[in-house]
Amino acid sequence: GRLWLLAALAGSLAGDVLLLFPGYFVPGLVSFLLAHIAYLVLLRQGMGWFPSRGALAVTLGVGAAMYAFLWTGGLPAGLRAPVAAYVTVIALMAAQAIGRATVQRDAASRAVAVGACCFMLSDTLLATNKFVAPWPLASFWVLTSYYAAQVLIVGGWLRGQTVAQAGVRPGAESLRFQ
């Protein structure tokens, strides 16, 4: 599991660096896409694919709505396919995280699910600012939601692994950490 976590963090770091430079949006997008695939595989461990069909439908619906908003808001034609792929993958990652939380029903998996949703929020804010209309303090809100996402996903995952290794039954752990 830790290799997938490290791969997700490495992909995110590469994306962070690439997005600092003009003209590197697509390579940065691809780096984050690979990071989300790594998170998706990580969150699949010990669990079926998309255990909550409702979460899958909602996250894909939110992703489709965001993509339509970007399309009509000025997303360049050359970015439509890469952005569509990215939106699909991040929605799948969020669906897997939410589904995992519905099965495990503990604080750690809920933190991961909230983190996945924060990632979707961060990317929505970033894309809206970049392709639709710039807005005040965009960088602050994008980075705040992005770092919250990473902290919640990584911290939640590591906490869940620690609890699992300690042999605490699912659900009981949430009482200990509150």
What kind of feature is each model-predicted range?
Residues G1-Q178:
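Polytopic alpha-helical membrane-helix bundles and their juxtamembrane interface segments
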